[in-house]
Design a protein with these regions (language model features):
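Conserved beta-structured recognition patch
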Residues: 83-190
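Enriched but not universal
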Residues: 187-201
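Activation on beta-sandwich/Ig-like modules and their edge loops
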Residues: 1-93, 98-132
Length: 201
């Protein structure tokens, strides 16, 4: 499957984030969201922060290319549930995974904090979990105040691999070191995932 990826995160008032489905999401699919940091030493999430589940309760599959918006109160424009927590305004993580908190299978990740490879994890720093790769299903913005970013271009007609690469490349994101990047400045997105051209034999 192609997974789901964050295309817009706003860590300043009002806290919001959007994801795009990169493959169809069957009805009753459950995806967990957390702003916990990942501890590379214990291969587990650090304590504190919030962990909550979103479920596709629409009665049908959500099509690839669909954008879903979540707010800090646990609301979603499709399905039910979400993070139900305010996102930090500096150095925040957001992970999407399936499975359990103690045995997660990661779908996508995002941080506006510090990525570390040694030392102790904090609320504003994280290891990158196995299964997540920068430029494929993880994006690290660096340590930015207010933690706001969005995919700059509005219209996308790309293969799945190209879509994943584009979304997770910081060169294709607009980031904010102030609280002025707001919902009103977000593009109206169109994500059309096209089939790869067949290889000529």
């Amino acid at each position: 499957g192609g997974g789901r990826s964050a295309i817009r995160v706003q860590g300043a008032t009002t806290d919001l984030y959007r994801i795009v489905a990169l493959n169809n999401i069957p009805n009753n699919t459950r995806i967990w969201f957390t702003d916990k940091s990942w501890d590379g030493g214990t291969l587990s999430f650090v304590s504190g922060e919030v962990n909550n589940v979103w479920t596709n309760t629409t009665g049908s599959a959500i099509a690839a290319g669909t954008v879903i918006q979540f707010d800090a109160l646990g609301g979603a424009t499709l399905g039910t549930g979400g993070l139900n927590s305010g996102l930090g305004s500096a150095g925040e993580q957001l992970f999407a995974y399936q499975g359990t908190l103690t045995s997660p299978t990661f779908v996508a990740g995002y941080t506006s904090g510090t990525v570390i490879t040694t030392g102790v994890t904090t609320s504003t720093s994280t290891y990158v979990p196995a299964g997540l790769t920068s430029g494929t299903n993880f994006v690290a913005l660096g340590d930015i105040t207010f933690g706001s970013s969005y995919v700059t271009a509005a219209i996308h007609n790309r293969s799945l691999a190209d879509m994943r690469s584009h979304i997770h490349n910081t060169a294709n994101l607009t980031t904010g070191n102030t609280s002025t990047i707001t919902n009103g400045s977000w593009p109206t997105y169109t994500f059309n995932i096209i089939s790869d051209e067949p290889t000529t034999q």
